[in-house]
């Protein structure tokens, strides 16, 4: 039921805010609304009950364990939210003079420096407004670098078959041809295939380390040498940065550019369509091409860099410098943790993943890469279970909802059949992990003894099996009031 379904003509709530607008007589007649907007007419109690009910139907970090692999669904401390919302930070207009925003700009400069430190990069720009936006900026800088050298023949980006789907999409948007290389039996990049793929046409390699398979690329030193010797650059997808936060730095591995998903690693909000933040870090060779604005420190005076400071910049990613409220949350989180706290994030995230992986192995679940240690997430494959019972990974995931757990990522990465990609993050307790293992064991037993029970799940939610194809093909995102 939508809020509009509660609407009744003339029903109103007391205004919570003062009226604004005043006299509109100075507006041209063609810009003035002639009809009342199609807004619901409801009481305050209707609104409170409606949205409270909706919140109770949602799965969220506040209420359930959320082991959504490669999404790092950690708990975001409330302090980060409350401190970042202080009006002293957010009241500044983005077009106001730098002199009037020294506190905010100083905070943003410190965040840039902390991100540089934790990633080992030479420079950071926080202009991109989402992870994919930062990814686009990173590949655009690779292109600008090669174009500046007159190396127009480099029009190929290499992408492993375990990469995030945004990687080939971004490369294509930036005008590159994508060349896919396989993963070997241990989940690592196939070095022989990489050597065969590089050449004078290679602009770069896009890599996630640890990978989406949950394993660390132990041959990263050799990988970066192969790519750099061929004249290409190395791109780091920061999706799994939480696993190595400050312990191992992409810059030290030889990466030339990285985008960071602050919603995964630095305690900013997930989902909802935004706002977001996707800062990019670069090695020395890409410093001239960073997107603007970024914050400069001129002998204690903080200011936003412009085209005059970076004439080779790829330009502006948005009207202003990212989303201020999101960046402030990341700043508070980084200050609360400090360098040692960030190290503990990586340690506990890895510990939780390996504990959960070991417990599920003991319970009889098959691991996609049983000889490898989990970095932050791992893959369970249910292929044997499906062959024996007909219960698929999707069925298993739906049944988990009945036990109060959000399902892990299903059917991704694509190269592992009937897979569950599980990432517990550092903020979950051992008791929570043990409860999840118990639910997994119970569902496995149900699949083996009463498979139809699992195939019919979920039973406890207001909606059950949705038509995903219809939802994707027949978009209906707007409310249309009845005539």
Swiss-Prot record:
One of its GO terms (molecular function) is glycine dehydrogenase (decarboxylating) activity. GO terms for biological process: glycine decarboxylation via glycine cleavage system. Its cofactor is pyridoxal 5'-phosphate. The keyword Oxidoreductase applies. It is an enzyme of class 1 (oxidoreductase). The modification N6-(pyridoxal phosphate)lysine is found at residue 264. One of its GO terms (cellular component) is cytosol. It catalyses: N(6)-[(R)-lipoyl]-L-lysyl-[glycine-cleavage complex H protein] + glycine + H(+) = N(6)-[(R)-S(8)-aminomethyldihydrolipoyl]-L-lysyl-[glycine-cleavage complex H protein] + CO2. Its EC number is 1.4.4.2. Residues 1-24 are annotated as: Disordered. It holds the Pfam family GcvP2_C. InterPro entries: Aminotrans_V_dom (IPR000192), GcvPB (IPR023012), GDC-P_C (IPR049316), GDC_P (IPR020581), PyrdxlP-dep_Trfase (IPR015424), PyrdxlP-dep_Trfase_major (IPR015421), PyrdxlP-dep_Trfase_small (IPR015422). Keywords: Oxidoreductase, Pyridoxal phosphate. It comes from the Bacteria. The keyword Glycosyltransferase does not apply. The glycine cleavage system catalyzes the degradation of glycine. The P protein binds the alpha-amino group of glycine through its pyridoxal phosphate cofactor; CO(2) is released and the remaining methylamine moiety is then transferred to the lipoamide cofactor of the H protein. Belongs to the GcvP family. C-terminal subunit subfamily. HAMAP family: GcvPB. The glycine cleavage system is composed of four proteins: P, T, L and H. In this organism, the P 'protein' is a heterodimer of two subunits. NCBIfam families: PRK04366.1 (NF003346). This is Probable glycine dehydrogenase (decarboxylating) subunit 2. It comes from Thiobacillus denitrificans (strain ATCC 25259 / T1).
